[in-house]
């Protein structure tokens, strides 16, 4: 029994010493997101940091409470000293928030589009349109086609950093809302998920935040349930 306890104690000491040997690294966002620290992570070897994913809410990054439902993901792509750089690899929106936006007597129209930006990044974009009243099938088809065309065109005409800002901060959603509401009454537009499929040129430049909000709302009051 004494031997077993001694072995157990020795194992605990080894585990404790291993943890103490780890070094903490600060994870920074790309310069297009401010180059801010979004978290810390420990590692024995800095090489093991490459590829790690760090998550942060858009609210925490921008200090805008209305962005609480959006989560952003950054992958570590380099280490210098105790600092780790990262690249944006996608975002999503909480299920609870999306469910709360769906109402009866409205139609939900989804679009999933793989696009390539001006600087060669391939991105999968998932967008959602909610109509103000129930739409017929031909209206849904027309809106979906128009959504896909707008997303493809904006990606083709902009660099990756600018396109990401348009997705997250409202430029892309506002463009879809403005064009598609001419076809049918709309209530809401969400760019609810994205995923970077291929990386292009490593171009980083500060991007001005669009004035429009991420969520485009119709000026009229909601349809009574």
Curated annotation (Swiss-Prot):
Q: Which GO terms describe its cellular component?
A: ribonucleoprotein complex; ribosome
An individual GO BP term: translation
State the disulfide connectivity.
Answer: none
Q: Does the keyword Secreted apply?
A: no
Q: InterPro entries in the record, alphabetically?
A: Ribosomal_eS1, Ribosomal_eS1_arc, Ribosomal_eS1_CS
Positions with biased composition (Acidic residues) = 206-216
Which GO molecular function, any one, fits this protein according to its record? Answer: structural constituent of ribosome
The superkingdom listed in its UniProt entry is Archaea
- Keywords on record: Ribonucleoprotein, Ribosomal protein
Q: Is Ribonucleoprotein included in the keywords of this UniProt record?
A: yes
Q: Where is this region: Disordered?
A: 206-225
Tell me which SMART domains the record gives.
Ribosomal_S3Ae (SM01397)
* Entry similarity comment: Belongs to the eukaryotic ribosomal protein eS1 family.
- NCBIfam families assigned to the protein according to its UniProt record, in alphabetical order: PRK04057.1
> Under what name is this protein listed?
Small ribosomal subunit protein eS1
Q: Which organism is it from?
A: Methanococcus maripaludis (strain C5 / ATCC BAA-1333)
Q: Which gene encodes it?
A: rps3ae
């Amino acid at each position: 029994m004494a031997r077993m306890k001694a072995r157990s104690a020795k194992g605990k000491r080894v585990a404790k010493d291993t943890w103490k040997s780890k070094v903490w690294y600060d994870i920074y966002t790309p310069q297009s997101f401010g180059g801010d620290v979004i978290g810390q992570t420990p590692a024995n070897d800095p090489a093991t940091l490459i590829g790690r994913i760090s998550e942060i809410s858009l609210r925490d990054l921008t200090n805008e409470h209305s962005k609480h439902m959006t989560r952003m993901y950054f992958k570590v792509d380099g280490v210098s000293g105790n600092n780790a750089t990262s690249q944006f690899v996608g975002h999503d929106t909480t299920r609870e928030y999306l469910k709360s936006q769906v109402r009866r007597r409205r139609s939900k129209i989804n679009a999933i589009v793989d696009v390539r930006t001006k600087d060669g990044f391939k991105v999968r974009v998932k967008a959602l349109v909610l109509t103000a009243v129930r739409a017929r099938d031909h209206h849904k088809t027309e809106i979906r086609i128009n959504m896909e065309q707008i997303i493809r065109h904006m990606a083709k005409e902009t660099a990756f950093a600018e396109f990401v800002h348009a997705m997250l901060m409202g430029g892309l959603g506002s463009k879809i809302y403005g064009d598609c509401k001419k076809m049918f009454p709309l209530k809401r537009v969400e760019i609810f998920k994205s995923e970077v499929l291929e990386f292009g040129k490593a171009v980083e430049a500060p991007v001005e935040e669009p004035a429009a909000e991420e969520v485009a709302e119709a000026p009229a009051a909601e349809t009574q349930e």
